[in-house]
Every structure is written in C-alpha cells, then in structure tokens.
Amino acid sequence: MAKKKRTRGPKREKRIVPVGVAHINSTFNNTIVTITDPEGNVLTWGSGGTAGFKGTKKGTPFAAQLAAEMAAKKAISEYGMKKVDVLVKGPGPGRETAIRALQAAGLEISLIKDVTPIPHNGCRPPRRRRV
C-alpha cells in the first residue's frame, strides 16, 4: 500500500519583535542565554552545549560568548530585534562576557538587571567541599 503524502499547513509568518528581553542564566557549569519578547514568549536561545562545548568547558566565558552570539544573531535575522533588556541570574563566569557578546552582535542594550535569587534564610545550603 502506498504511503499517504502528508500535507503541511501554512507556514507561520515571522513576526517582527523590535524590543525583547535577554535572560542570561549563568551557573558554574553552563551559561544559558534565552531571548524572549516582552511578554516572556521564547524566541530563541543558546547555551554552552549548543555552541559545541562539552563538560567543564560549557562553564567558560568563551562558551557563554558564543552562546550569546548565536542567540543574538538569530533574534536579529529572524525577528528584526534591535533593542534588549538584559536580566542576569546566577554567579557563573559567563555573565559579563555574554552581555558584551550581545552588544557586539548588534543589539542595543537598554537595561541590565541582576535577578539572582537570594534566600532570606531558606533551605540549608550544601556542605562546603574539601578538595
């Protein structure tokens, strides 16, 4: 029996989002850059892993730079983005590098805000490592 040919529906037209929000989540192991519209709907993202790094190299500033560049270039080309507000979360080494990479890629940064969660004496932290 011949296979039925599946027809695709109409392709979604790309919407233009001139202003967005870049969320940079920087941990010691990885840096994830997510670019959203002002409502919070994800448009594009990049991380140390999607930039081609594995293991401990994902946490490096260079991996964060490449991840931010990838996300920014896609946001500019596909969504016509020009301006971003940057929300930085976490203590990782890729924080500043990712912000610089967004600026170098051609996005105008209008606001940088640190939204790292700080406990008001919440859960007990893990024990100190003895190396």
From Swiss-Prot:
Keywords: Ribonucleoprotein, Ribosomal protein, RNA-binding, rRNA-binding. One of its GO terms (molecular function) is rRNA binding. Disulfide bonds: none annotated. One of its GO terms (cellular component) is ribonucleoprotein complex. One of its GO terms (biological process) is translation. PROSITE patterns: RIBOSOMAL_S11 (PS00054). It comes from the Bacteria. InterPro entries: Ribosomal_uS11 (IPR001971), Ribosomal_uS11_bac-type (IPR019981), Ribosomal_uS11_CS (IPR018102), Ribosomal_uS11_sf (IPR036967). PANTHER family: 40S RIBOSOMAL PROTEIN S14/30S RIBOSOMAL PROTEIN S11. HAMAP family: Ribosomal_uS11. Located on the platform of the 30S subunit, it bridges several disparate RNA helices of the 16S rRNA. Forms part of the Shine-Dalgarno cleft in the 70S ribosome. Belongs to the universal ribosomal protein uS11 family. Part of the 30S ribosomal subunit. Interacts with proteins S7 and S18. Binds to IF-3. This is Small ribosomal subunit protein uS11. The gene is rpsK.
